[in-house]
Amino acid sequence: MSMLEVNDINTYYGKSHIIQGLSLKVEEGEAVALLGRNGVGKTTTIRSIIGFTPPKTGDILFKGKQIARRKPEFISRMGMGLVPQGRRVFPNLTVKENLTMAARGAAKGGWSLEEIYRYFPRLKEREKNMGNQLSGGEQMMLAIGRGLMINPELLLLDEPSDGLAPMVLHDIANIVMQLQKKGLSILLVEQNIKMALKIASRAYVLNKGQVAWEGPSEDLRNNEELQQQLLVVSA
């Protein structure tokens, strides 16, 4: 049984048909990348899965159970975490308060502050600082920490590299890989192709709301012509 199975979903914004018959899978303990140019439907796919913009048709199975058109709160309690695009930490709460507030949605167990701080020692150092006092990299660490506090079995990451310096990007990528090795399933939306293919073992490339290519990350990494065709923005 797959951790996540998306079958032929169609998602609309008003009358605009954004996601068109999209299917994908994430196996237990697997990291999968969702790639594509801006505006091809990557974030809408994430929003469809987590329940913010439910698909009109199609099935989404999480741990074998139908979640298409269920409320985000229900899906979260089942064990699906989200690190949203733009990080969206609470600016007027401390690091510690941001984390403990996220833990309220945990269905079972949840991560402890000590576990979060073990992965992100910088957050321990900054635990009394407000969210708006953190650097972009620290905010991303906090956003991932918030996503982990509900003890997810699947973590959705939407553009974690956005606006981060290369050194910080390296650290974030290593942490995500550590989480995957710990057994966490990951679906990663990312514009940074190199980072995404380093983390994920498989990839899907979207174009106009549909899957244009899928396969092992190594195949895409070694195919510059395909990258130019589907991923690189023309000048």
Task: List the predicted regions and their residue ranges.
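Glycine-rich phosphate-binding loops of nucleotide-dependent enzymes
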Residues: S2-A235
